[in-house]
């Protein structure tokens, strides 16, 4: 080569170096990325110096249009991870809160159930106390009623035994006789003046006062005769005996009328109805002192066909409905029912039933209380009524008879 060619070579080399310094070749490599996700471009030196293979990695800012989607995607991925982490923590906290709420709700339900049970027990106790109070008041009321009846009977018996103090001005009516007491001065004035006593209706006048042996005086009011008490002159006694002097004769009475008159006071002294309108005297005249016992006036007893085979049992018949009873007291109570007089009323709440006899009221009250006082000795079964118990005991008797018959058949 010539010298000129040799001279040109270093010149060209210098130019190439300058060009390399001014312009570096940029080579894009797919696998070169930084930890933050940005791309790195490889700069290669010129090929004039093959021996020198120096490689430099220099981060270069890429155009916004190329780098923006990568950074956005990275940011989105980081944001999603950050969102996932708090969302998972929120879910855990929410689950814990829900579990706590469920536990609180369960505890509240248990407390409400316990409160309901307590309220129910308290209500049941109140109801039991009310029923006990009602039953106790009913028993007390019944005992008070029985005591009052006994006191009335005792008072009536004492009145029958003791002399009855009355005044001359007695009132006599066709249905009922009412007696009143007046002051002793009025009695003495009437006795001294020998004047008769006028009745309330003004229809009957008393006979004049007539002296009796021993200084006693006697007054007649129709068919009633009053005699002065020897111990106390201010008291008067009713007597059935007529005056010693001749007077207006009383009309003759039939035996049936006398028996009816005897039955009326017995019914009144037992606290029963006054049957004077039905069985009393036809003329409306007063009645004398009644005996302690009186004969039954039912049709069966009047006809004297009431004795059966053994002659011990009696049957009393109601003349209104032909019902039969074994006791005269039951018949009298039944007659009270016909007259509408039912003195024994049930005191239970919302119960307006009435009865003619106290035992019927007691039997009815057991339907409210549920008491079963009659127990079977064989099987222990309980009943409210004694007749139900006797009917039940017959089943045991029939079973015994059947067993005995079967045993006899086997032995034979």
UniProtKB/Swiss-Prot annotation:
Disruption phenotype: RNAi-mediated knockdown causes defects in cell fate, embryonic morphogenesis, and embryonic and larval lethality. Defects in gastrulation; failure of endodermal E cells to internalize at the 26- to 28-cell stage. Reduces cell cycle lengths significantly in endodermal E cells. Significant reduction in expression of end-1 and end-3, and enhances the disruption of intestinal development in an end-3 mutant background. Reduces number of offspring, and the production of oocytes is compromised. Failure of cell death in pharyngeal M4 motor neuron sister. Gene3D superfamilies: Classic Zinc Finger. Keywords: Metal-binding, Nucleus, Repeat, Zinc, Zinc-finger. Residues 44-53, 398-412 have a biased composition (Polar residues). One of its GO terms (cellular component) is nucleus. The keyword Metal-binding applies. Residues 1-53, 77-97, 136-210, 390-412 are annotated as: Disordered. Pfam families: zf-C2H2. A zinc finger (C2H2-type) spans 316-338, 344-368, 374-396. It is found in: Nucleus. SUPFAM superfamilies: beta-beta-alpha zinc fingers (SSF57667). GO terms for molecular function: chromatin binding; DNA-binding transcription factor activity, RNA polymerase II-specific; RNA polymerase II cis-regulatory region sequence-specific DNA binding; zinc ion binding. It comes from the Eukaryota. GO terms for biological process: animal organ morphogenesis; asymmetric neuroblast division; nematode larval development; neuroblast development; positive regulation of apoptotic process; positive regulation of transcription by RNA polymerase II; regulation of transcription by RNA polymerase II. Belongs to the Sp1 C2H2-type zinc-finger protein family. Transcription factor. Binds to GC-rich DNA motifs, such as 5'-GGGCGGGG-3'. Involved in cell autonomous neuroblast asymmetric divisions that generate one precursor cell and one apoptotic cell, by transcriptionally activating target genes, such as cell death activator egl-1 and leucine zipper kinase pig-1, in caspase-dependent and -independent apoptotic pathways. Plays a role in the regulation of apoptosis, cell lineage, cell differentiation, embryonic morphogenesis, vulval development, and oocyte production. This is Specificity protein transcription factor 3. The gene is sptf-3.
